[in-house]
């Protein structure tokens, strides 16, 4: 794409010749992502002016927003950093990073650091991954220096890239920038490093039609129902280029197993449903091996090296969407359901409307997806518009969050002031934990401030919170109290006395409506 390359070079030159921009900007590890968003601005505006509906191939263009480094640091520190302190509460990490509600005692079973995984399912050019690399590096050094862990400093870059950080995005160019950024970081830490296997992948890969590989699965003695499930999953995988990490693979098998368990609850255990459960567990174990074999066999039969690479990417994608993570971070795309194109709407309604309605906005589907991708004690850290906090159509989202997660820290930012001036959006950022917790949830309310004052106010209020100093912008509330008001709006700042009024009967229940 020579024209696009020329545009990128011109963009670099404009910045380099701008006397108001300091030289230090070129030392920032997220400079590539920042430039890429600037490069896309004209295309974004053209799409916005077209008034077209947002289809899968325009999601990145329509809603790709560069996440400022301070936001990334806050979210990663309070998810990955806090998870580490839950295992090592006496670590020096708590003195070096600003982590809210840092535990004083061990709250989590110790897990080897090289087994802890973080994913960004809409990673763009990799801002979250780049900072996660830095924090993971510090955690490894803490393990070596203070906990006698059996790691060597020279191995840390490879451990982080091949074991700890994962990312998926629809945008192939953004993924290339994310991979390049991580490679540069690894090279800075160890200049001789080579042959890294990245778990950062574009879902824009190629798969053949199922008919071309079906014989691999036919040798597995599948039932007709299982054969149909294989075809459905293959189709989902084949069209991952449209929907990226929102595609569900392993969940379809798990849903089938759960339906058998529900049948057992209703009808009791018998030989047939016991065999069904055993069959599906065996099916699950062999399915992914067969799927990988099918992809590899197809790739090896082709002489086109590019096609082989793009087909092999499917194996990495399959692995990433099928495993569980300790932390999921995201600044997901924002698109209201009224702006969905036909294909996108059909996919979202099919996969994210039941049993809870997460189909009202694209960012809401990523809340659900991050929950699904994390393990039973995982953490979720996200930034996106705050519309889900109050609007009726997001009631199911709020109910899901309150029923199934613990709100650790929540910042209601408000309109403007978080992202660059061209991103005219409301924002909120928060950290959720899937592990049960009886502690009060912490909130910060900044949305009524003038946008230019929010950043400084945030820093002061956050420092006050960490130092247990009263601040009018900070609030704590038992999460259960957010369920008192009908439809569960996140109204966290009112007094208990006022909140209790919502427990009493409403006017329509107390008065009889009469005619005449």
Where are the language model's segments positioned?
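Short, flexible/disordered secondary-structure transition segments
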Residues: 46, 50, 86-91, 143, ...
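Short, flexible, glycine/charge-rich loop motifs used to bind or transfer phosphoryl groups or to couple energy/partner
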Residues: 106-109, 154-156, 316-319, 400, ...
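Pocket-edge positions in alpha/beta enzyme catalytic cores
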Residues: 63-64, 153, 303, 355-358
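Cysteine-dependent PTP/DSP-like catalytic domain, specifically the C-terminal lobe
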Residues: 144-173
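Signature of N6-adenine DNA methyltransferases within the class I
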Residues: 130, 137, 170, 175-198, ...
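Post-Walker A helix-loop "phosphate-sensing" segment adjacent to the P-loop in P-loop NTPases
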Residues: 136-143
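Preference for the N-terminal adenyl/adenosyl cofactor-binding alpha/beta module
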Residues: 1-135, 164, 168-177, 198-326, ...
